[in-house]
């Protein structure tokens, strides 16, 4: 289009910025006013104009830009050009700058002065509140992913517009100022200092970071001299030591794994008190929630330690996969997040092999499975046409299904081939952008396998298959259909990498199943079938992202194999998880699921038992609605099942115990408390009362505190609130975020609806940071779901004004999804009809679908003729 024909109108309502001008370098100066919660700034952008134009169009949001503060100087020109008009388009978050003259093709410098507010929304350039010597103070922090750099300075705020950044900050002289690169020079002028940072390599805007506040740090160096620091609030630096150790090891490991050195001279990691996500991988300056970075030897639990290790590894993986090689557009977000999730487990397994993290990884797959079994799921590669849609795809599909299909592919291609091909991919696309197809091409070239064909069915369409298996005349008959939790028939078809073993792991079969149906002649099958202990397991060690449904004969054989401890931990997990999902979808009876649970009575592996517990609690919630008269019997069966484990592991750690024992102890005791087990509740209350008097008592170590708090809340009601008040007192007194989160996660587990309501109100008080509301919401117990839904409707206007992004979607999903009747589903549909904006549309749809699925499960359970007898029978038999 000729420059003369351009008009401002054509740039409105577009998903992407026009391509006729691109930034090459930003000289950015920011002056934050910490007390006044505002900032001013100026940016000089070297712009490459590639086609004649009278317009420059870039992103800006919530910034004040006056036309007098904008000018453009073509390279080599005498005179700068002043715009005829500067239009701010808030709904598109763009700035349209119109000149009377046509800008010549080539480089020029665009200068813009601007002002903004240090907001309290945890995105853009924002303020976070902390205490120093008993006084509340503001720090200035940035959070730009996915599209909020535009809230700090005008820029081309899309991942493919990579540029160099030279940053200068003017800040109070006593503060610490950090950015992506090391400081080159500081000039102090009385109360203010100017801090000049080294130029960055070529990078995307969403990875730029700036932080100003008062901090301490701990420091170490990698073997090749990269400086690593963990910054904390003043007085908390000792809590950064564990993360520092992990970071140093991780940088060394990834340098080897990706065959490319870490590209920057330093790595800073910092804990931010108010932080919306878990962490953010800004190049060279990674920001974290306190709970994901700090570890207190005395008061943090084993689960906290694992969380820190995995999150640090995840964020540092991004320094290569995301920062050095960046997705071309948000459609390919999964490349960033799925990959970093997968490789963070690879790192954790490398440093802590005794944690069995690859078995724990199955929890990630399960979360992906649950979301992807909804009709309202989305493909891994999802079209993004508006900036408001981006936040919602930071979900279990991009992270967890993404990680699971990468693991499936690595397992199919082999670890070595996979690693070499990745290194080639990173080398080829370093300092630029890539699409999903580029990764497939690199893996195809390295392996000689048809990776693109194999993977298209997993990333371009939503959902996943269930493979139905029957044994007939010495042949395995297999059929694949799309699995949906609603029990409906989906239409998808996949190229499924099948692995199977028969009677032992010594011989495995592998093949691609890409038809609808296939018969498989297993040469050793007839021989194997004659054995008394015959069994067949598909999806060996659960490396594939699909479910398996066995005919009755094969299912009972697997139950035997579990009882006889013939299956690996991952396979024991998989059989249970698949059976539970099939039961929920109405494809199997609840009775057979309960019989299967009984087969795990000698289970030894933490992750498998945690899955048994999770499944059991979810059955309890459903039976409470479907067959309340049988609830007591069901709880008795589950308590009788779990009690021997609890007696064995006890409340107190024994010498020689490991990390997984600590995780199991907390999970097991919490479950018994939730089931109303009196002995557990009484012991918890006894220990808690001692803890209230003496916070240093060894009787309530961090690993069992959550269990004790949940148990305590089972004793609370509106006329006896002592336990609740004691917990609130501890909450207010502790300055350890992990302790605060433990308490928040327990408060709403109370069976009294009035108390649940009070805890929800407390969550919106200034006592609870906005970011932490999700922990309280997740902790709402079975008795509180309807109260929480009524409460959400009443408070919706306030909540939707106060919370944004992922936090707002959490309010919807955690409150709506657990409801279990069609009436509730109708109510939610009606309520959100007039209240759904683009940023929550997907979540609302998915949550209401979950309610429908729950209601259907309740109905199919009610219809099970012999359920009452079975509940009676199992509660006596075991």
Swiss-Prot record:
GO cellular component terms listed in the entry, alphabetical order: cytoplasm; endoplasmic reticulum; extracellular space; membrane
Pfam families: ERAP1_C, Peptidase_M1, Peptidase_M1_N
UniProt xrefs under InterPro entries: Aminopeptidase_N-like_N (IPR045357), Aminopeptidase_N-like_N_sf (IPR042097), ERAP1-like_C_dom (IPR024571), M1_APN-typ (IPR034016), Peptidase_M1 (IPR001930), Peptidase_M1_aminopeptidases (IPR050344), Peptidase_M1_dom (IPR014782), Peptidase_M4/M1_CTD_sf (IPR027268)
Annotated positions binding Zn(2+): 314, 318, 337
One Gene Ontology MF term: zinc ion binding
Family named by the database record: Belongs to the peptidase M1 family.
Quaternary organization: Homodimer.
Protein name: Aminopeptidase M1-A
Gene source species: Oryza sativa subsp. japonica (Rice)
């Amino acid at each position: 289009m000729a420059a003369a024909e351009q008009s401002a109108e054509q740039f409105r309502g577009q998903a992407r910025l026009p391509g006729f001008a691109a930034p090459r370098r930003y000289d950015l100066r920011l002056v934050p006013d910490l007390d006044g919660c505002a900032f001013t700034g100026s940016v000089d952008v070297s712009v490459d104009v590639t086609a004649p134009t009278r317009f420059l169009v870039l992103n800006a949001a919530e910034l004040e830009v006056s036309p007098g503060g904008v000018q453009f100087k073509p390279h080599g020109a005498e005179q700068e050009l002043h715009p005829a008009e500067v239009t701010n388009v808030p709904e598109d978050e763009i700035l349209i700058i119109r000149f009377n003259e046509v800008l010549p093709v080539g480089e020029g410098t665009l200068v813009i002065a601007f002002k903004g507010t240090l907001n309290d929304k945890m995105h853009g350039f924002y303020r976070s509140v902390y205490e120093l010597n008993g006084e509340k103070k503001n720090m200035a922090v940035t959070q730009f992913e996915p599209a909020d750099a535009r809230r700090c300075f005008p820029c081309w705020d899309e991942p493919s517009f990579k540029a160099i950044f030279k940053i200068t900050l003017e800040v109070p002289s006593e503060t610490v100022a950090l950015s992506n690169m090391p400081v080159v020079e500081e000039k102090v002028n009385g109360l203010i200092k100017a801090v000049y940072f080294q130029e960055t390599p070529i990078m995307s805007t969403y990875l730029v970071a700036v932080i100003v506040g008062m901090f301490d740090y701990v420091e170490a160096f990698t073997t090749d001299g990269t400086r690593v620091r963990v910054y904390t609030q003043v007085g908390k630096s000792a809590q950064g030591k564990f993360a520092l150790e992990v970071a140093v090891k991780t940088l060394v490991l990834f340098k080897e794994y990706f065959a490319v050195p870490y590209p920057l001279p330093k790595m800073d990691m910092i804990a931010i008190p108010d932080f919306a996500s878990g962490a953010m991988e800004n190049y060279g300056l990674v920001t974290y929630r306190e709970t994901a970075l700090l570890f207190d030897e005395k008061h943090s639990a084993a689960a906290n330690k694992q969380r820190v290790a995995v999150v640090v590894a995840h964020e540092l993986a991004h320094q290569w996969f995301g920062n050095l090689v960046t997705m071309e557009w948000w459609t390919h977000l999964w490349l960033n997040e799925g990959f970093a999730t997968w490789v963070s487990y690879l790192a954790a397994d490398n440093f802590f092999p005794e944690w069995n993290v690859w078995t724990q990884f199955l929890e990630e797959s399960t979360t992906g499975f649950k979301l992807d079994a909804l009709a309202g799921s989305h493909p891994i590669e999802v079209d993004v046409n508006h900036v408001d849609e981006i936040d919602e795809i930071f979900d279990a599909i991009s992270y967890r299904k993404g990680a699971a299909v990468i693991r499936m592919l690595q397992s199919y291609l082999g670890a070595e081939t996979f690693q070499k091909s990745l290194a080639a991919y990173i080398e080829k696309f370093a300092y630029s952008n890539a699409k999903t197809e580029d990764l497939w091409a690199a893996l195809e070239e390295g392996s000689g396998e048809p990776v693109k064909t194999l993977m298209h069915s997993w990333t371009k369409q939503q959902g996943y298959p269930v493979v139905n298996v029957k044994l007939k005349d010495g042949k395995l008959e297999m059929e694949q259909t799309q699995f949906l939790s609603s029990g409906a028939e989906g239409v998808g078809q996949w190229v499924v990498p099948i692995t199977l073993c028969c009677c032992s792991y010594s011989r495995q079969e592998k093949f691609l199943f890409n038809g609808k149906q296939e018969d498989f002649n297993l040469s050793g099958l007839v021989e194997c079938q004659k054995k008394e202990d015959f069994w067949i397991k598909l999806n060996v060690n659960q490396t594939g992202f699909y479910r398996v449904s066995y005919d009755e004969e094969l299912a009972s054989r697997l139950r035997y194999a579990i009882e006889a401890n013939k299956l690996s931990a991952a396979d024991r997990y998989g059989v249970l998880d698949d059976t539970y999902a099939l039961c929920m979808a109405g494809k199997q009876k609840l009775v057979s699921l309960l019989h299967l649970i009984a087969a795990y009575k000698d289970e030894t592996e933490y992750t498998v038992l945690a899955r048994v517990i999770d499944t059991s609690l979810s059955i309890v919630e459903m039976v409470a609605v479907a067959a309340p008269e049988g609830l007591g019997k069901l709880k008795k069966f589950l308590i009788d099942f779990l009690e021997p484990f609890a007696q064995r592991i006890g409340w107190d750690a024994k010498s020689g115990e490991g990390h997984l024992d600590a995780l199991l102890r907390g999970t097991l005791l919490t479950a018994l408390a939730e089931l109303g087990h009196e002995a557990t509740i009484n012991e918890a209350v006894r220990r808690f009362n001692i803890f209230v008097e003496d916070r240093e008592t060894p009787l309530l170590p961090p690993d069992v505190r959550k269990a004790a708090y949940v148990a305590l809340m089972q004793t609370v009601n509106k006329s006896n609130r002592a336990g609740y008040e004691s917990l609130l007192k501890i909450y207010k007194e502790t300055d350890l975020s992990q302790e605060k989160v433990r308490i928040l996660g327990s408060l709403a587990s109370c069976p009294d609806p009035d108390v649940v309501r009070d805890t929800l109100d407390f969550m919106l008080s200034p006592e609870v940071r906005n970011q932490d509301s999700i922990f309280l919401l997740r902790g709402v117990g079975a008795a509180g779901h309807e109260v929480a839904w009524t409460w959400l409707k009443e408070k919706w206007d306030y909540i939707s004004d106060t919370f944004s992004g992922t936090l707002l979607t959490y309010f919807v999903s955690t409150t709506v999804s657990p409801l279990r009747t069609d009436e509730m589903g109708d109510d939610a549909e009606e309520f959100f009809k007039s209240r759904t904006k683009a940023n929550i549309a997907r979540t609302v749809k998915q949550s209401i679908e979950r309610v429908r699925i729950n209601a259907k499960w309740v109905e199919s359970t009610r219809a099970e003729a012999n359920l009452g007898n079975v509940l009676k029978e199992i509660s006596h038999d075991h």
